[in-house]
Amino acid sequence: MGKITFYEDRGFQGRCYECSSDCPNLQPYFSRCNSIRVDSGCWMLYERPNYQGHQYFLRRGDYPDYQQWLGFSDSIRSCRLIPQHSGTFRMRIYERDDFRGQMSEITDDCLSLQDRFHLNEIHSLNVLDGCWVLYEMPSYRGRQYLLRPGEYRRYLDWGAMNAKVGSLRRVMDFY
């Protein structure tokens, strides 16, 4: 079970809304989001309703302003609680669409795909175990995308506008 609290103003001030499960539309509860407290669980936040737009991965902790979660604005319109996974993590990445081209298997965090696999683009992937966050740039920076178990035949399937990938991280709650 997870718990996240959204605040309209910075520094955990103003109107707030507490959430403990997936919510496809947060608009009825607050007009803007400038700070967040994650009491438990790992969450993916989305700038638009129905899990659309920029995504932001948050784990337990305090985020006193939207720059702390690498947000582009104070717009958070939907959220998803990421289920905890206690087993192994496994993903296969491919250099071309539809699982074609060279395949590499990943079982742990990857700070730089370029350094480790000599890749800066992934065109398809298959998440076999666990949930992952894909980052557009190395060192877990840039746009973020939640990858749940399943097949992603092209980068559009995970919500990206291009195949650029810099790093990958397993979703784990370390607290």
UniProtKB/Swiss-Prot annotation:
SMART domains: XTALbg (SM00247). It comes from Canis lupus familiaris (Dog). InterPro entries: Beta/Gamma-Crystallin, Beta/gamma_crystallin, G_crystallin-like. Pfam families: Crystall. GO terms for molecular function: structural constituent of eye lens. Has a two-domain beta-structure, folded into four very similar Greek key motifs. Belongs to the beta/gamma-crystallin family. This is Gamma-crystallin B. Crystallins are the dominant structural components of the vertebrate eye lens. Residues 2-40, 41-83, 89-129, 130-172 form the Beta/gamma crystallin 'Greek key' domain. Residues 84-88 are annotated as: Connecting peptide. Keywords: Eye lens protein, Repeat. The gene is CRYGB. The keyword Repeat applies. Monomer.
